[in-house]
């Protein structure tokens, strides 16, 4: 057995197991030389910077926040593997704005989980939680109560001037009576929604919709559907209670309605879950926890501050890193490609492998080890490849095996050379629920029989004695006797199940006999309901194949139901 076949067989065996433990291996350092990891860090860092620039300059990004955040986490891991400092939070925000903000936009650090939240809250007091509204960050500047500037966030220091769009956004007061002589507010322009439930509907592209309306040269009718959520009042009142009350009086009601005091991390957990499921007038992607005490505005910088933190909702899209690529040969001779990924948990299910279909499909995806893909769970919890979101810079060439000689009627026996993978797949199917459904008999057992040369064809196991079965390492006499009895009882399985177990391409009635079915002509098969000419030819080829005839003759000698000779 060559190395390729051994690799295929061993992977086929483990792919039939269920993952019941483990952890998402995001903290694993890649097994790369120092020169390569340096190249990969640089490439990923540049890509993240491009996406960040698109987000802050254009209001949207080619990737979702979920994808960006997870790839940013991956960059941190790679940097730590080389002993490099984490620069992701302190790196200046890219942007090309020309208008200076009176007070810089600080941005938010992201808390990874409840443990990180608890750690950050420890020792802090006067904390409040708000929904993290998913919109376009802006600065509002009022002089003597009159709105004089509406600036985009830009790079946090300078932004674009959108003041001419402000009169078309009814949610923004154009004049505030009794306002401070100089009033600077920071907040989020968002698309007004009618009872939006984040848990059910997700982001619905709301932020990009608002950004597009703001960036148009002429005013868009959509601006009338834009709301504003004020989340920062630099150099404003010292208490949050006073801030939200005054904001409401000035014409910004959402901040008061959606700001809640919290005493412990459990309060934050409760509000986060509530807002995730409750009908809201805006799209959200998490919550923000902030403390009342904050520095004077002149000390704010365009990097995340320490007085507020974001705790985002669980990602809607899950990234997995491709660890290896395996090629498996199924019982019908069709090859499939299975991606082995670093373990990832989706909806309480651990994912380690993803079947992506044919070799042709794999080539179309252009996936190599080290690439990062997005996964989702399809029907019955089966993982599905959605997209490739990041390709490693150095791509190792992988050559798929040549399976041209394999087909639906090949490898009913262990030999000739190269048949082991398909032969093993046939045995797994035979003992599985689609075949004879022999409990406790799977790929591992069949591989042991093949390895010890105790089986050479698809039904040779019927000749095994308890002593031969017990000779397999790890199988004692008691279990060997149980397996032997299971094999003997399999002889009484219905004829139709035996045909399915052998690979017959059509279900037949339970009371049929081999010799009766064998006498049917091609035209008789073709006229049967649900078969047709093409399926009839497949059936005829199956009956006429010498290996199938040999299997039937053997089953006849074993007095298997339906295969007995009749007078």
Swiss-Prot record:
GO biological process, one term: DNA repair
Swiss-Prot/TrEMBL keywords: DNA damage, DNA repair, DNA replication, Ligase, NAD
Catalysed reactions listed for this entry: NAD(+) + (deoxyribonucleotide)n-3'-hydroxyl + 5'-phospho-(deoxyribonucleotide)m = (deoxyribonucleotide)n+m + AMP + beta-nicotinamide D-nucleotide
NAD recorded as keyword: yes
Annotated EC: 6.5.1.2
Disulfide bond positions: none
MF terms (GO), sorted A to Z: DNA ligase (NAD+) activity
Record flagged with keyword Cell membrane: no
Superkingdom, taxonomy of origin: Bacteria
Enzyme class label: ligase
Segments crossing the lipid bilayer: none
Pfam families: DNA_ligase_aden, DNA_ligase_OB
SMART domains associated with the record: LIGANc (SM00532)
Active site positions: 132 (n6-amp-lysine intermediate)
Protein family according to the UniProt entry: Belongs to the NAD-dependent DNA ligase family. LigB subfamily.
PANTHER family per record: DNA LIGASE, DNA LIGASE B
Reported function: Catalyzes the formation of phosphodiester linkages between 5'-phosphoryl and 3'-hydroxyl groups in double-stranded DNA using NAD as a coenzyme and as the energy source for the reaction.
Protein name: DNA ligase B
UniProt gene name: ligB
